[in-house]
Structure formats: C-alpha cells, structure tokens
C-alpha cells in the first residue's frame, strides 16, 4: 500500500515519510502541486496526504482539479487554518478528512487507517488477474485460491504489476517501489525480486519487455 505526501516544508515532509514507512507503508514525498500531479499520473497510490500551503498552487484548487480528473483516492488535508469555513470548503471540494497543524503522529496514523478502511470497504480493495487475486486492504495475495507468502517488496511489485496488467511497467517505476523498502538497493535488487516473484506466481506470468521493464499477463504459457 503506497501513500503520496504533498508538503512544502522539507523537514516536516521527511518526518512524515519516515513515520509512514515506520507504519509499513511505501511512500513518495513531493513539495509542489506540479510534482504531485506528475506522481499521480505515473503511479498508483492508496491515499494522499495534502498540505494546503503549496508554493506553486493553492492546495484546495489542486484538489479540485484532481477530483475533476476522476482521481478517487482518499485525501487527508493538512493545514494550519482551523476555521469552520476552511473545513467546510475542504470537504466540499473533495477532501475526505482534515487534520490541523500541529498534530500528533498517533492521530495522523489513526486517520490514515480509518480512511483506508473506509475506502477499501467500498469494494475497491481486490484485484483479480487470471488465477491471481490480491487484496489491497489486507496485503494478501492468492494463486488458484492458495495464499501466497510474499515479502513486502514482492507484494509491492505484484500489486504494481497487477494494477497495470497487460501493459508494460517501466523498470524505474518498479525500482522506485523497491527503493521505498530498501535504503540502498544494489543494482540487481529488482531482478532478484522479480525472479523470486516469478517462482511464486508462475515464471511465464511476468514477461520481460526488453529495454523497458516488465509486464504481468493473465495466463501462463504452457
């Protein structure tokens, strides 16, 4: 499960990323609306934490735009403003929850868990590709009804490949998923985890797209 954090305060951003990773989430952090939009276009996120005071665009305006583009991920707003009108406006344009600075990390974690539970209970938590099934909310995967034993890195790779099933995923995107779990991955880290994942889901299910990356297909080659 991956979270996007949008916060222009560098120290706070680093602290939020570390806190999210400590809770077991993969995490990307950016400091501008432009970078956040690029991240949404190129990746898949289960939730976004959004500060309203961004340097290049008002956070509420940015949120309005991404909702108009049909991004449905839950959004938790962070802000220093605590007026009733601010909260109402944020919720009206598409925020799912609202947290006022300064805040305790325990409350942030609790709100993230609640938003993810609520979103997953809306029926968006399960993916199926051929004989593979993945439950995003529970971090579980099955092959032919048998639960797979996956490391966090293997789960991150499988979820990315299943979300883009039938389409190639660039190595850099997959490498970044691994990097969220590994501070200093070696150059062959991705290949090692792809090899291990193939052993579990079927060697022919994950195809190498030469010069680009990897692609998950629905059926195994006989």
Curated annotation (Swiss-Prot):
Q: Which residues bind DNA?
A: 124-218
In UniProt terms, what is the effect of altering residue 81 to R? Answer: In strain: LT2 / SGSC1412 and S4194; resistance to polymyxin B and neutrophil proteins
Q: One Pfam family, short name please?
A: Trans_reg_C
Task: Recite the UniProt keywords alphabetically.
Answer: Activator, Antibiotic resistance, Cytoplasm, DNA-binding, Phosphoprotein, Repressor, Transcription, Transcription regulation, Two-component regulatory system, Virulence
**Outcome (variant: residue 51 to A):** No activation of BasR regulated genes
Consequence of gene loss (knockout): Abnormal expression of genes encoding virulence proteins. Decreases fitness in the spleen of mouse.
Alphabetically, the GO molecular function entries are:
phosphorelay response regulator activity; transcription cis-regulatory region binding
Q: Which SMART domains match?
A: REC, Trans_reg_C
* PTM section of the record: Phosphorylated by BasS.
Subcellular location per the Swiss-Prot or TrEMBL entry? Cytoplasm
Alphabetized NCBIfam families for the sequence: PRK10643.1
Kindly state the subunit structure of this protein: Homodimer.
Q: What is this protein called?
A: Transcriptional regulatory protein BasR
């Amino acid at each position: 499960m991956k979270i996007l954090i949008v916060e222009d305060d560098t120290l706070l951003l680093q602290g939020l990323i570390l806190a999210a990773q400590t809770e077991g989430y993969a995490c990307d952090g950016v400091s501008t609306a432009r970078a956040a939009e690029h991240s949404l276009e190129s990746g898949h996120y289960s939730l976004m934490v959004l500060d309203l005071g961004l340097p290049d665009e008002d956070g509420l305006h940015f949120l309005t735009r991404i909702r108009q583009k049909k991004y449905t991920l839950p959004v938790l707003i962070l802000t220093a403003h605590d007026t009733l009108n601010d909260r109402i406006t944020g919720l009206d344009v598409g925020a799912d929850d609202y947290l006022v600075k300064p805040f305790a990390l325990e409350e942030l974690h609790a709100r993230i868990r609640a938003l993810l539970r609520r979103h997953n209970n809306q029926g968006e938590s399960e993916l199926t590709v051929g004989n593979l099934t993945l439950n995003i909310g529970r971090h579980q995967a099955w092959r032919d009804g048998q639960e797979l034993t996956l490391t966090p890195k293997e789960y991150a790779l499988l979820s990315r490949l299943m979300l883009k099933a039938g389409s190639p995923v660039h190595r850099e995107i997959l490498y970044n998923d691994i990097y969220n779990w590994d501070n200093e991955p070696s150059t062959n880290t991705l290949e090692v985890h792809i090899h291990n994942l193939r052993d579990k889901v079927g060697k022919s299910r994950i195809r190498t797209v030469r010069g680009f990356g990897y692609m998950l297909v629905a059926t195994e080659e006989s």
